[in-house]
Amino acid sequence: MGISKMTLPERSLLFAKLASIAYNDNIKEVKKQAKSLGFTTVEFYNKEGAQAYRFQNKEDLVIACRGTEPTQFNDIAADLKAAPVKSESASRVHRGFKAEVDELWPMVLEDITRTVNKDNKLWFCGHSLGAAMATVMASRCFYEDSIRDAEELYTYGSPRVGWPGYVKTMQTKHHRWVNNNDIVTTVPPWLIGYKHDGEEHYLNAYGNVRKPTRWQRFKDKLRGLWMGIKRGQVDSFSDHSMVNYINYLEMYAKGKENSQS
């Protein structure tokens, strides 16, 4: 079954798993995991610390960008380079995120142009830094005459990527998942001009999908912080874990909820 025929919960879980797999360096394991999810072709991109995978079958092509690795200096440097620079479209984008994509884009663009046929659909996903990279890549598709536009973009724990003018140019449908107090979703700060893109899907302190008011969200964040303290965890960091995103999205895909809320 093609991705476009899946429900939103099913797609959200699939892309979360692919975004998680993108952290794996063992190509043999990655191919095995990808096959279990229905993908027959796997390609790894790696240049100057910027990394992504291409997962492909007869119907779909997915670019999954790898997120921040604490042991990789380039990843940390990319996160810290928050100064905005001119984008390919309009307004300004995060300097570090753009630089990471600049490293990989020629290879990714060449492969997409070469391998995508009229029956293939193009998708992007990523977690953390990978979410930001996937956002920048998806936005570039609209300005490339040689390839089709991306179907949709799925991100998990994404930082803000660009200024409002940049966000307005985004043509790809963006499903942006946020887990309660995930600290990465709060940076770079809006005070220096950055804005989130896409439709937010919020997971509350119990891992259930909600659309809270500002007041409800404030209370839910306090609840999450208190629950983290009781577990001996820093909630802002544990909520960024891809494991938690996947666990909650598995419940969502099954139509289940945590009974506490």
Each predicted region: which residue ranges?
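Non-catalytic, mobile gating and regulatory segments of ester bond hydrolases
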Residues: M1-C125, L129-S261
